[in-house]
């Protein structure tokens, strides 16, 4: 990077491991400025529990970004609504979590931050607080007024994007329409080029049905919907291979010649990726007007404040965000 950049981090659920992981991030120097949108006392208390040094530096958007020294974080303060006790969810803090996400998102939209990295939230407690919340992806899509976003998870070796996300199985076949596939593949192709620096992305596309429909004997969605869309997009120059049976696609024969996989639904593509690299994976939201990465795990309430949480996924998410910033410059 030609000059230091500034990214914003949201720790997520205050009773979970998110604050622990953010404190652990601070134990090394970073070539970018890490602005944490959180309650300062929460981070200080959690650092003391973990026995780790932490100094909080004031955030000033008018001061040029600078590399982050080890043992420090730059604080963009948002106040807790109630005390946060490790491992104990508090409905009163649901609005706090949403406020951190909103402030971080708005900062990316107005150019304050080059990327957003999110820690794990607890969707249930946010909804229990009376705030409808499906997840980070949908929240940022709505707040940024993005036309459409695509969820992609990645490890060092594998990228898997999803045509549909949090839908029950009985609804998926109806959701796989030509319009949806055109939109999802266009976003995936565009962001692989612009945010990952891949000049001509090669995308493997899963079929929907077992054996990719077996020529129509196990479902006709491939023949009626998926194949016509892929043919149209290939004619435009996209490098698409599929539809392929999901049970044989995830092997070196195919993956060695691909930059990403498009799965038709959540549990078709993600079990393979998480088996291969759980704890090292990153969740990326494609289609947003800014870079957003996230850890691939939950709040792990039982580990909060105990010094046993693994910071690996957070480090990977932050490093990937840095690479994506470089690719977009």
Swiss-Prot record:
Name of the protein: 4-hydroxythreonine-4-phosphate dehydrogenase
Cellular-component GO terms for this entry: cytoplasm
Classification via InterPro entries: PdxA, PdxA_fam
Miscellaneous remark of the record: The active site is located at the dimer interface.
GO MF assignments: 4-hydroxythreonine-4-phosphate dehydrogenase activity; cobalt ion binding; magnesium ion binding; NAD binding; zinc ion binding
Oligomer and partners: Homodimer.
Organism: Salmonella typhi
Cofactor notes: Binds 1 divalent metal cation per subunit. Can use ions such as Zn(2+), Mg(2+) or Co(2+).
Listed Pfam families: PdxA
The keyword Amino-acid biosynthesis is annotated on this UniProt entry: no
Segments forming a coiled coil: none
Record keywords, A-Z: Cobalt, Cytoplasm, Magnesium, Metal-binding, NAD, NADP, Oxidoreductase, Pyridoxine biosynthesis, Zinc
EC number(s) from the headed UniProt entry: 1.1.1.262
Single Gene Ontology BP annotation: pyridoxal phosphate biosynthetic process
Main location class: cytoplasm
Residues engaged in binding a divalent metal cation: 166, 211, 266
Family membership noted in the UniProt record: Belongs to the PdxA family.
Compartments (UniProt record): Cytoplasm
Keyword Cytoplasm in annotation: yes
